[in-house]
């Protein structure tokens, strides 16, 4: 008599239906969902549309918790770009464990500098002039989307001037004052005659609604780029810039104390609570549950982030520009889709060839890029939003990867072997042997399984080994 042996461990793939309506992208005709741990689910949904054909979206729904928290990752410097695998490598080299990542802000292809605001680990590491919509994340994992406009000033105790940009490129002929830290890069990248003020930070930090005290080390004029000393702050401007600003900087001297202040214009204190944030020139997709529609036309791959009414956060990507696989979407369509997913607020991030999502799935040794970037390769971009995995080893088995003869038919009297290839604990760390796995055969037959996973098959019917 034939019988079938089935092996069941804690299964990774959840073949549950996607509950949100998906009419805006077409009729759902496939997909999958995976529980990542840390209150995080990864979804793929496949659609077919009569008007544009196939669509493939990949998104994560995250319930805020401290086992995994959203952070913004730039890499070693603001200047330059890196692809998502390089960003993950940077994280791991610095003791950070990525769970899920998506690309974030628009950026200059020439310099790699993001076009908006970036706050990382409680510090403003890139500031634009004027306001933009932005997403902020607190240390407990909660998030919000709100207008962000930071006014930065530097004062010598008597007079103050505006600092328009933090860690942006000071180009020849530009008027304003810039502030650079060693996070900008190794040098200032300046190409004209500038006045430089080298300072040592004393107290405080570059954060919203906070001040930082500086001591002036040196003031000088130089034509070209200079090194940014580690741990120092550099105030600079083109010597042909605004005379009021130039006069202020030129009067400074070594030993003088300065105060840098950053204030969120028109804010109610919300931005002071954030530890990580990124803005976007791509604009707001959803405001108070209503999809915005005032967008330029044109379908493309898309990346977005949204906040649901219950506080859950959606990290969203939609592939595009790939005939027969995924068409992409217009921004007004993306906005409607974010509403379908339950978002009350949503922000459009850099899309097109930049759209990328990666994940470290349970039972795997490293991350993998899940979507299909439209360039055909991983584009290097300015920065990313990652879920940083804070979980520590538990040594409690969760995912069991096996080899051997499973889900096959056998004759009574035969023996089948189940071999464990690897075991991952409930925090998705690979466990070392011995695994202390115990087998049990659930069956109406006389079949048995021993402590080594050898199944003796007797009788007729299915054998489930758990």
Regions flagged by a language model, labelled:
Residues 66-67, 105-109, 142-143, 151-152, ...:
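Solvent-exposed loop/turn segments at secondary-structure junctions
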Residues 252-259:
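Loop/turn positions that initiate beta-strands
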Residues 21-236:
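Zymogen propeptides
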Residues 4-22:
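Sec-dependent N-terminal signal peptides of Gram-positive bacterial secreted proteins and lipoproteins
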Residues 263-277:
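Short, Lys/Arg- and Gly-enriched loop/turn segments at beta-strand edges
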